[in-house]
């Protein structure tokens, strides 16, 4: 190593020591730089070493300033752990890489050191531990000397039962009216002070379909919550007071739970009220669907916002519960993702076969309920 070339870079001791962070472990970069300077001085004599330099611009001496900016933005956010990230001028990053390559590329980046050292500083001042899965992430912009915060969302798992034919699962962008998402989310916002909320459902039912039986799994996400720990039973009581939506089995969860409920596919049991010119032949038509594979092209009613694909779905059975006055009550068990209304009406030939085509007369679903989702509870 050419010590003269090294100190001719005119870096501060911290930035000098960081060039060799992987060589002499057990020391801080500043201590490592001081040792290198001692070696230089013993050969070449005294020289001025800048306290700050063009590489770090004194950023490691600005922790108190960054802390004050952070405190002005915390606004009573509740958190138990922290993580620090940072951004530096790309020119600084490239300059550092170039310098380190000249001396064997055995150092660490300024970002890595800053995140570590400012993280230790914050952990001590805030009394909160460091975590890779932190409640609060602090992002420092070293170039513009600013601090931003990212609050980890709160995820709450539950199961809902919907006893209404007038509410959608999620909010519509350009429409008003209640939804499962808004009924739960507005109460969640009131209790957590979150900026927004998002419902993640394990599948969905149409607006006019009731979700009964053992209910549908969901996760409600509170974005940028001020309060992380709330009484989940109180949330349940508030939502259930609506009289049309009932939630239960609430527990804190995570993004992994969202992925799980989104990926799992479960057979479902439906009760459908069907109208048409009904006679005794409907029983024979229903029997044709025992363990039958049908083909469904994306229904016309949803074609504007879903891909036009043909999907093969298994129908386990269609059983008749009762027939009276031109109405039949059917019990239908089918694979996840089956369009039940189209299974009955045929959707102008886009579902083949349909109950209407097998029966030989047009049938329509006048009401539909999901009464069971076959999952491992």
Swiss-Prot record:
Domain of life: Archaea
The keyword Isomerase appears for this protein: yes
GO biological-process terms attached to the record: tRNA pseudouridine synthesis
EC number per UniProt: 5.4.99.25
Binding annotation for substrate: 270, 339
Name of one Pfam family that matches: Pus10_C
Active site (UniProt): 206 (nucleophile)
Alphabetical keyword list: Isomerase, RNA-binding, tRNA processing
Cross-referenced NCBIfam families: pseudo_Pus10arc (TIGR01213)
HAMAP family, sorted: Pus10_arch (MF_01893)
Family stated for the protein in its record: Belongs to the pseudouridine synthase Pus10 family.
Name of this protein: tRNA pseudouridine synthase Pus10
Lineage: Archaea, Methanobacteriati, Thermoplasmatota, Thermoplasmata, Thermoplasmatales
Gene: pus10
């Amino acid at each position: 190593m050419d010590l003269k070339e090294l100190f001719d870079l005119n870096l501060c001791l911290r930035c000098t020591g960081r060039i060799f962070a992987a060589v002499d472990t057990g020391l801080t970069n500043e201590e490592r730089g001081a040792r290198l300077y001692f070696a230089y001085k013993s050969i070449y004599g005294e020289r001025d070493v800048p306290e700050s330099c063009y590489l770090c611009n004194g950023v490691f001496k600005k922790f108190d300033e960054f802390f004050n900016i952070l405190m002005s933005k915390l606004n009573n956010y509740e958190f138990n752990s922290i993580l620090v990230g940072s951004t530096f001028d790309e020119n600084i990053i490239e300059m550092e890489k170039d310098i380190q390559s000249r001396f064997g590329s055995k150092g660490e980046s300024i970002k890595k050191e800053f995140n570590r050292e400012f993280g230790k500083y914050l952990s001590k001042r805030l009394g909160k531990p460091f975590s890779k899965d932190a409640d609060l992430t602090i992002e420092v912009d070293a170039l513009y000397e600013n601090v931003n915060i990212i609050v980890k969302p709160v995820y709450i798992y539950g199961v809902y039962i919907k006893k209404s034919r007038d509410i959608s699962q999620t909010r519509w962008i350009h429409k008003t009216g209640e939804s499962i998402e808004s009924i739960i989310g507005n109460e969640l916002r009131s209790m957590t002070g979150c900026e927004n909320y998002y419902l993640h459902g394990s599948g969905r039912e149409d607006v006019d379909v009731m979700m009964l039986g053992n209910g549908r799994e969901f996760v409600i996400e509170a974005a940028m919550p001020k309060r992380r720990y709330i009484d989940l039973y109180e949330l349940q009581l508030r939502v259930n007071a609506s009289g049309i939506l009932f939630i239960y089995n609430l527990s804190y969860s995570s993004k992994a739970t969202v992925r799980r409920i989104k990926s799992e596919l479960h057979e479902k049991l439906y009760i459908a009220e069907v109208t048409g010119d009904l006679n005794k032949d409907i029983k024979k038509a229903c029997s044709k669907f025992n363990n039958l594979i049908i083909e469904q092209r994306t229904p016309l009613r949803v074609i504007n916002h879903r891909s036009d694909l043909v999907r093969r779905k298994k129908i386990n059975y269609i059983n008749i519960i009762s027939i009276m006055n031109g109405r039949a009550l059917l019990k239908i068990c089918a694979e996840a993702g089956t369009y039940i209304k189209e299974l009955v009406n045929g959707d102008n030939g886009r579902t083949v076969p349909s109950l209407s085509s097998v029966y030989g007369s047009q049938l329509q679903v006048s009401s539909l309920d999901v009464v069971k989702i076959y999952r491992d509870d």
